[in-house]
Amino acid sequence: MLSTLKYPDYKTLNLQRYARILSSSVCVPERVVTNDDIIKQHDLIATDRAVQYSIGIQERRYADEDANVSDLLSEAARLCLERSHVQPDQLNRVIYTKLMGDQMIPATSIKVLQKLGVRRSIPAFDIMAACSGFVHLLDMAIRYIDTGDDYVLILGGDISSRLASTKNKKDTRTIFLQGDAVVGMLLGVSETQHFLASYLYTDNTYFDYSFIPFGTEMLNKTKAFSNQMFNMQMPDGMVIHQSVVDSCELVANKLLAQTRLTLDDIDVFITSDQTTFTWKAQLEKMNVPAEKSASQFFKFGNTVAALSPINLQEMIDTGRLKRGMTVLFMAHGAGASGGGLIFKY
């Protein structure tokens, strides 16, 4: 591991009011974009076979140019509410983990409330934690329910293809990676404990290894404004890959120690799959059979905070995850953050 930081010990979850997952959803644009589509559009020196060999992706979804992420998010939210037979005005809180959102302010989660027709002035806000954002939201949601909320809606993902590269310059290290998708999850109150452990961390060692430059650091007189400010920058992809694999081992072991479980007690093992090979490397590191997990990177690409929830939904939709099963759910973001939870589905 590159980092020399000390990772904190786990703290046992001390909850008096329990949460459970009522429903979940995935919403993707209709437009399918293949590797060949990208190669032809940008006249790149690459082949579909080479792209699949290097990162394991076949296709991804792109949103229409006039689409906003709040359009996708509101649909994902509606699906969650319908599946749980919960009305929008019953929500106590909405939190969205974004990459960009519709705009910088106000929060995109507020726009979702507007599109859902919510008539109550409930809290709604956005956070940013890259690919690990959804585990942060899950941790927050179970604590909000512990302190009095009845229904917490959490949302993740974005129209991240627009940050793969600009029209002026195409970066072949990132242009094939990104895909557009969002996810939703509705949590409610339970009489029994479902969430058994939670562990989150950040590691500033990796701050400069995956980033989007735009910010006050770039908006000064010594820097020329450029579209490159909005590009996803990844100076060393192998460092990010290894940080994810290392994070997987660290977080999984912290969670298992917290619950006194072993991997044999885990029915479903979910983690973020920034590439197909990163997912496989994590399973190999933990000696987890592929049948216990899922990766949809080959189909949707890097959907940032939606990565792990999409894999979870795949296990649900295919019947491999059933109520009562034990899930180890993790996500690792941009090298600089990560975490996970163990819960009974």
Where do the protein language model's features map onto the residues?
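Phosphate/pyrophosphate-binding loops at sites that engage ATP/ADP/AMP, CoA/4′-phosphopantetheine
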Residues: 76-92, 250-267, 315-320
